[in-house]
């Protein structure tokens, strides 16, 4: 009888750990996948080189669920948001940092802004 109780507790623990860990792993994996899709798109389709990119980070949002924030070295005060789903990768927004706004950066000054047409 005692063995069945112990087995049940171990099984319950495994299930609970799985419920917590699996979503975390899936989220991190998707962020990594999206980051790589955007990086590949920028380098292979848009002609950037790795050195042009200051940072690239996969994010979890609401809509779109996963997106990527890219900062280019020639515009460190602007964050560009990219969507990457299946084979579709496109820039859907940008954000000028507080520092960039203090410097007076406006949309017409953006060097890497490429809205989807």
Protein language model annotation of sequence segments:
Residues 1-6:
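Short, Lys/Arg-rich N-terminal segment immediately upstream of the first membrane anchor
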Residues 7, 20, 60-63, 102, ...:
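Compositionally biased, intrinsically disordered low-complexity regions
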Residues 8-25:
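Hydrophobic membrane-insertion alpha-helices, especially the h-region
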Residues 11-15, 41, 109:
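Acidic/proline-rich low-complexity IDRs
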Residues 24-53:
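Short, non-transmembrane alpha-helical segments in secretory-pathway proteins
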Residues 46-52, 57, 66, 94-96, ...:
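N-terminal low-complexity, charged segments
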Residues 50-85:
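Exposed beta-strand-loop-beta-strand "reactive/processing" segments of non-cytosolic proteins
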Residues 78-117:
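Structured, soluble extracytoplasmic/luminal domains of envelope-associated proteins
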């Amino acid at each position: 009888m005692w063995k069945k109780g112990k087995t049940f507790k171990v099984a319950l623990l495994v299930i609970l750990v799985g419920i917590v860990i699996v979503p975390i792993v899936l989220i991190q994996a998707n962020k990594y996948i999206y980051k790589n899709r955007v990086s590949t798109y920028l380098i292979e389709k848009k002609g950037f080189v790795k050195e042009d990119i200051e940072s690239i980070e996969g994010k979890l949002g609401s809509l779109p669920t996963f997106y990527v924030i890219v900062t280019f070295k020639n515009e460190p005060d602007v964050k560009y948001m990219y969507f990457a789903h299946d084979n579709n990768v496109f820039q859907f927004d940008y954000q000028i940092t507080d520092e960039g706004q203090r410097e007076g950066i406006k949309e017409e000054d953006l060097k890497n802004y490429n809205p989807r047409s």
